[in-house]
């Protein structure tokens, strides 16, 4: 077994990973940057793929693909404890995030990850705010991802980019505590060996520079996707905007933070996603935000509301028979995230699916406690195999994190929704804690 020693000096025994060992035999590390990222990220990925029953062939394919494409896209390695560019994805400033997707009606879990593509030009005079990294990466990797289409990606990138002659102004106005990120890219690693790419656009650079709100930038960009045949996102946008108008105090209003699309060819009913941050510290507030104050209705919404209620009661140990439990404050200062997945339609009614993201590192619970709560949840929803191994899987994937001890923050968010096809649908987002253990 391999012995790993993190920056805190405590040694941990890492589980042998035969597929990773096989991949390692066939590669020659050609740079210190690639060697650093591979050393930090390959073992968790290999462990998660193995634990979640991907075939050997598919595991080898994904590990080799990851080495070939993702490591260079992460850019130069950190130096002297500081990242090369300084963008981040997670609360602990890691530029990478894993996730594990669970569907109630499926026996398989899907591994995913998110990055921000960075180049040697990022942060230099050639590309001061990293507006080129994502495009360069996706154009290159698209040759190796069948079905990838960048039409809408390019449209959204242009809509949220800062004009070249205004970049200096944007930098001067940019608050020090704001993230430097421009575009995130995520991949779903399907068990078939096929990849699904998604892109996420942060509009805050453009908003700061132009004085136009992020809500307006994203709303206008979505409206530009309406079609001449009458299919549009107007019904969904109108429902969202009508709900936002009910907040009379700007500081209490949900804030739009991300616009997302799937990097595939557009089809009728193509989905777009908008992300809002909101102070949903009680279940009552979360449900109001989830259904846009009652604007989203029907059996599918009823099932979703029941699902998030049941999980909320389970997570916080509340009594579902006590009406007061819906108004009990359970989350601190950090805001929850609501994702409105809109599909184009011919009518005026909204066509929206919603996901609710809870900030797990803010709950006063260790990763071990969260793992045990999730295990009992999976057990009660027909997944005893996942329940029995979830905590140990995390401990194996992240041996430096001390999952069974007092670790906090490996779980970043957990999202939940419900669809007729999947039943309950949850994603556990996981930080590799790169600054803590590798910088």
UniProtKB/Swiss-Prot annotation:
Pathway in which this enzyme or protein is active: Secondary metabolite biosynthesis
Keyword Transferase: yes
Biotechnology: Iso-A82775C is a precursor for the biosynthesis of the anticancer natural products chloropestolides A to E via a Diesls-Alder reaction with maldoxin. In the absence of the prenyltransferase iacE, siccayne accumulates instead of iso-A82775C and can also be condensed with maldoxin to produce chloropestolides H to K, which show also antibacterial and anticancer properties.
InterPro entries: Aro_prenylTrfase, Aro_prenylTrfase_DMATS, DMATS-type_fun
Induction of the gene: Expression is co-regulated with the other genes from the iso-A82775C biosynthesis cluster and probably controlled by the cluster-specific transcription factors iacI and iacK.
One example of a Gene Ontology biological process annotation: alkaloid metabolic process
Protein name, entry field: Prenyltransferase iacE
Pfam families registered for this protein in UniProt: Trp_DMAT (PF11991)
Top-level EC class: transferase
Name of the coding gene: iacE
Keywords: Transferase
